[in-house]
Amino acid sequence: MAKFVFVTGGVVSSIGKGIVAASLGRLLKSRGYSVSILKLDPYLNVDPGTMSPFQHGEVFVTEDGAETDLDLGHYERFTDTAMSRLNSVTTGSIYQSVINKERRGSYNGGTVQVIPHITGEIRDRIHRVASNSNADVVITEIGGTVGDIESLPFLEAIREFRGDVGRQDLAYIHVTLLPFIGTSGELKTKPTQHSVKELRSIGIQPDLLVCRSDRDINDELKRKIGGFCGVPQRAVIPSLDADSIYAVPLTLEDEGLCREVLDVLDLEDHDSDMVDWAQLVHKLRNPGPAVKVALVGKYVQLNDAYLSVVEALRHACLAQDASLDLHWVCAEEIENQGADVLLKGMDAVVVPGGFGNRGVDGKVAAIRWAREQRVPFLGLCLGMQCAVIEWARNLAGLTDATSAELEPGTTHPVIHLLPEQQDVVDLGGTMRLGVYPCRVSAGSLASRLYGEEVVYERHRHRFEFNNAYRNLFLESGYEISGSSPDGRLVELIELPEHPFFTACQYHPEFLSRPGRPHPLFRGLIEAAQQRLPCSPSEAMRQQNNSAAGSSHPSLQP
């Protein structure tokens, strides 16, 4: 039978509940326990798929095609465990389900209320994750802040959960903030006390407090917090600001978080194996030479809009003993100032996914610059479509070529709507979503990077390469290096004569992990490193490798 951990947050929003939940998942897994983590989001949207990236950040796509909160990306990257649509729950999806049941007569004419019907549906979703995942421990992060009216049904549901399982089968963790007041030179505990008081008024007594702070929390302060909040001093867990989110599991391990959780859950505290994770963090803190990577997008004002892309680049740099010098480049600014100005000195260019017309010409200009300057380039989803548009306009002489998404009446729709999308009206949850196979062409750059004939990647798109232009595309020197098994849908393109120029219709960033970077991102960073000046000893090593025919085998033509 599964055990359950609930993570709430107080004092301020964006306090790091998702990282705490993901870190606990990592620590439990290091002790041999299987884990599943779900997010309860208090907004009324059914899912974040139609929400603006400026408001919500990126949409993380699961294997089964759910459009979810970006925290699920943290869960997957930290635990190396695939989540599903069951792991993402919103207020909108709960109300939709309850109303649909009411319309079907499932409540036998009863009055449908927040309690017990909404809270009961929430509890059912948590139980469903436990039964479908067969996890030893199910961790649930409750979005929002204690005191928000939107979160009340979720908090009531996790209070009621005590009646579903034994008290020894669940633990409540409350993440809070200890602000430092410079004039008094003190960390203040009063906001934490009031946050816990609010939680208690709902009927939840936290078992552990994770206290965020920018400086050390001494034993006297922990004793004070524990006394006022009704938790043992040992269960007051400091969480100091970290230089990397990947350092947080190690910090929380040192502070005893997992040990205390296991004690509350009456589970054995097995030996923990965090050696590989510690080595990863050591490499993060002691990186090699920096590679300058330009991320050209339309949502660059909010970095979270491209969170998984950035993490995938970090993973690749870790594997290549490089440090990431990331440059955020607004695609619209390229339209105003030119690619030569904004991309000068870059070692690689990434054009990620997106929707809509704004900034597309800037992305196309960035891709042209990377192609002509022979700078390593990786395009993702819309980035691949922009690479096709760039080819059509600048190499195929189709100067008005574009995507049918951007200009439905274009005479040269080199990107057009997927046939199965022709009659789709609703926007939410209706794209080509989730994992699909891609057959990789033998002898291609992609084949050398993947080392596999068939790969499975996550998708999120409505538009595709228009096969009416396939022959012209191939005659121009480009290669279609990956396609759907039936050969109809173009999944990967590349330019063989270029040091590294590849783009994919899918989102490889969702499959990258700290200790297992995605091959396309690792290939990009490896190619970017070839542009760096190297020390005499490194130059000699490369010369020897070249003489032996073994320099960078994954990128050899």
UniProtKB/Swiss-Prot annotation:
Region feature Amidoligase domain, mapped onto this chain:
1-267
| Oligomer status and interactors | Homotetramer.
Q: Which family does it belong to?
A: Belongs to the CTP synthase family.
| Annotated GO biological process | 'de novo' CTP biosynthetic process; pyrimidine nucleobase biosynthetic process
Per UniProt, Mg(2+) binds at: 71, 141
Activity regulation, per record: Allosterically activated by GTP, when glutamine is the substrate; GTP has no effect on the reaction when ammonia is the substrate. The allosteric effector GTP functions by stabilizing the protein conformation that binds the tetrahedral intermediate(s) formed during glutamine hydrolysis. Inhibited by the product CTP, via allosteric rather than competitive inhibition.
Q: What is its EC number?
A: 6.3.4.2
Q: Which HAMAP family match?
A: PyrG (MF_01227)
List the catalytic residues.
381 (nucleophile), 507, 509
Q: Where does L-glutamine bind?
A: 354, 382-385, 405, 462
Reaction(s) the record says it catalyses: UTP + L-glutamine + ATP + H2O = CTP + L-glutamate + ADP + phosphate + 2 H(+); L-glutamine + H2O = L-glutamate + NH4(+); UTP + NH4(+) + ATP = CTP + ADP + phosphate + 2 H(+)
Descriptive protein name: CTP synthase
Positions of region (Disordered) = 532-557
Question: What does this protein do, in the record's words?
Answer: Catalyzes the ATP-dependent amination of UTP to CTP with either L-glutamine or ammonia as the source of nitrogen. Regulates intracellular CTP levels through interactions with the four ribonucleotide triphosphates.
CC per GO annotation = cytosol
Which pathway does the UniProt entry assign to this protein?
Answer: Pyrimidine metabolism; CTP biosynthesis via de novo pathway; CTP from UDP: step 2/2
**Which residues of the sequence carry a binding annotation for UTP?**
13, 188-193, 224
In terms of InterPro entries, this protein maps to:
Class_I_gatase-like, CTP_synthase, CTP_synthase_N, GATASE, GATase1_CTP_Synthase, P-loop_NTPase
Residues annotated to bind CTP: 13, 148-150, 188-193, 224
Query: Do you know which PROSITE patterns this protein is assigned to?
Result: GATASE_TYPE_1
Q: Which domain of life is it from?
A: Bacteria
Ranges for domain Glutamine amidotransferase type-1 come to 292-534
Q: List where Polar residues composition bias occurs.
A: 540-557
